[in-house]
From Swiss-Prot:
Residues involved in NADP(+) binding: 77-79, 84, 260, 310-315, 328
Catalytic activity entry: D-threo-isocitrate + NADP(+) = 2-oxoglutarate + CO2 + NADPH
Recorded GO MF terms: copper ion binding; isocitrate dehydrogenase (NADP+) activity; magnesium ion binding; NAD binding
One cellular-component annotation, GO: cytosol
InterPro entries named in the record: IsoCit/isopropylmalate_DH_CS, Isocitrate_DH_NADP, IsoPropMal-DH-like_dom
Site (Critical for catalysis): 141, 212
Record protein name field: Cytosolic isocitrate dehydrogenase [NADP]
Binding, substrate: 79, 96-102, 111, 134
Function field: May supply 2-oxoglutarate for amino acid biosynthesis and ammonia assimilation via the glutamine synthetase/glutamate synthase (GS/GOGAT) pathway. May be involved in the production of NADPH to promote redox signaling or homeostasis in response to oxidative stress, or redox signaling linked to defense responses.
Amino acid sequence: MAFEKIKVANPIVEMDGDEMTRVIWKSIKDKLITPFVELDIKYFDLGLPHRDATDDKVTIESAEATKKYNVAIKCATITPDEGRVTEFGLKQMWRSPNGTIRNILNGTVFREPIICKNVPKLVPGWTKPICIGRHAFGDQYRATDAVIKGPGKLTMTFEGKDGKTETEVFTFTGEGGVAMAMYNTDESIRAFADASMNTAYEKKWPLYLSTKNTILKKYDGRFKDIFQEVYEASWKSKYDAAGIWYEHRLIDDMVAYALKSEGGYVWACKNYDGDVQSDFLAQGFGSLGLMTSVLVCPDGKTIEAEAAHGTVTRHFRVHQKGGETSTNSIASIFAWTRGLAHRAKLDDNAKLLDFTEKLEAACVGTVESGKMTKDLALIIHGSKLSRDTYLNTEEFIDAVAAELKERLNA
């Protein structure tokens, strides 16, 4: 029986990327998406050569289009360093596309593991996923820091419309040292709170916010207070009805709890904590190649889904020479499924939602049936790894496509 393509009423934004992930991106689209779904795709090429050719305007345009259409699906991209500037002959060292997009969308990045029963976890107690929400604005990432030479007094000045307030920070008496001033805004913290509450409510999981408000009484205290305000005003009754809860915890207490918990909650982290803890979680669950990443905007309606890993340069160099690669495409496939699932929810498209669930199940089912890429086979087999224990890049995508067709025809 021929599969009837699923019609999608509204467009999605596609952001193409670089290197090996660009190669698998095309394969995923050709083998797992377009044969089954009739999509209006607003395409933006965020590959480094095209970003350079457009003076990075394409990145800004893609983010603006995301605001308009509410759903973006993004391939991994290169953030250039000096070496890349030389390699590509770039006009300048362009900023991280992810950073640019996050600043325009003012979103919170949620990362969550994809669990396959046969891939061993470093933390075996984690039987359910832990979704980590990273506030992707301000703090250390927008800070001003300085090296202090010699003795002197460090002060902090704020000039408001009612005049100037000066706060004494420290008096250096010796050789000097270092200093830093950082900030956040009530608007951004409120948006972070709303995105976190919304994500936990959608998943019907409890929500925890971690801070160090015992030390940073005013700074972290503001996060704690705003989260509590947002919860009481907009979410408490919904959470009570769903049998879930919101709680603030100290970061050290939360890290200890995370390690001994079974999972099954959303963890809202400040910017730096989220940067660190999301990698700790990815490794604990088994692999960065099994991690989804979704940027959720404060309107609760706009998202950008992507893989949580880079462009897999090492594999791309082999691919360029015509060699065989075994690159894990699962996180990139899940970028498509999470984006399309959100489109399905916005459009009330049950068929599309069912398709995304079956494609995710086909990915996990393929791995659990023993068909996987080399990185996962290495976690399972270790030193006993041999060529017959894994598939190459295209073979794996073909295996997922076969599994998907079976599930769609069942």
